[in-house]
Amino acid sequence: MLDEGYESRIIDGKVLAKKIEDEVRSGVEALVSGRGITPGLATVLVGDDPASKMYVRLKHRACERVGIQAEDHFLPAETSQEELISLINTLNKDQNVHGILLQLPLPKHLFPQEAMEAIAPEKDADGFHPYNMGKLMIGDEGLVPCTPHGVIRALEEYNVPVKGKNVVIVGHSNVVGKPLAAMFLNRNATVSVCHVFTDDLKKYTLDADILVVATGVKHLIKADMVKEGAVIFDVGITKEKDGVYGDVDFENVIKKAALITPVPGGVGPLTVAMLMKHVLGCAETNY
């Protein structure tokens, strides 16, 4: 249980996600009435990984809420690379599909990077295509990865200044750490990127005005590793029999943080909401 008074420090991802979805719904309605275009998202799932199935369901439910037409493509686990690429090429040519999402991870015999590169950059709703990543690196933020986009949107929504601030990102994946570092640099923050192998991680995290943690290591960040008044985004998630945990020791760290995202209910809903925003943007821009 949280001590009384700490609730105001929580960045409620569900509330902000609803606001974003309301914006998307209005945009979809305007696109349908003004140009006769209904935004469409195609999801591609290979195999029967339970977590991946759940994530796809969440995205389809979000599509229903905002008026995006969603279609699902479930492929058996033994699908070949050629068959996967063939489906992606078909979706690239489908004018009713404005965004394509390849749900990861893929079965081990497949090559995810090659598959993602097969997606037309203008339909890359997840923002993972090298073309879109390259644009991000030179400051052209069109389609960017959804989780980093959600973090930036939350900072804007809570009026957290970024320019000149010390930002520390723990985790250097292509999905979160690297693109988010570029987005912070584009906003003139001073950025340090660390990971679980960084020597003396605490030395870096203690200096963070804004701390983003995305490692998947349960409670990696303790209260003595953050400074008073830091803004903290917990992107990691660890599922155990007794519950779901983030990378941050939430109950203790919140006592020092100015703002912090919970797990669950923090960054996750924002990621899905930003995906909806991206699909709308794809439809508005390319058709």
Swiss-Prot record:
Pfam families: THF_DHG_CYH, THF_DHG_CYH_C. The keyword Lipid biosynthesis does not apply. Disulfide bonds: none annotated. Pathway: One-carbon metabolism; tetrahydrofolate interconversion. GO terms for cellular component: cytosol. GO terms for molecular function: methenyltetrahydrofolate cyclohydrolase activity; methylenetetrahydrofolate dehydrogenase (NADP+) activity. InterPro entries: Aminoacid_DH-like_N_sf, NAD(P)-bd_dom_sf, THF_DH/CycHdrlase, THF_DH/CycHdrlase_cat_dom, THF_DH/CycHdrlase_CS, THF_DH/CycHdrlase_NAD-bd_dom. One of its GO terms (biological process) is methionine biosynthetic process. It comes from the Archaea. NADP(+) binds at residues 171-173, 237. Catalyzes the oxidation of 5,10-methylenetetrahydrofolate to 5,10-methenyltetrahydrofolate and then the hydrolysis of 5,10-methenyltetrahydrofolate to 10-formyltetrahydrofolate. HAMAP family: THF_DHG_CYH. Belongs to the tetrahydrofolate dehydrogenase/cyclohydrolase family. Homodimer. PANTHER family: C-1-TETRAHYDROFOLATE SYNTHASE, CYTOPLASMIC, C-1-TETRAHYDROFOLATE SYNTHASE, CYTOPLASMIC-RELATED. This is Bifunctional protein FolD. It comes from Methanosarcina barkeri (strain Fusaro / DSM 804). The lineage of its organism: Archaea, Methanobacteriati, Methanobacteriota, Stenosarchaea group, Methanomicrobia.
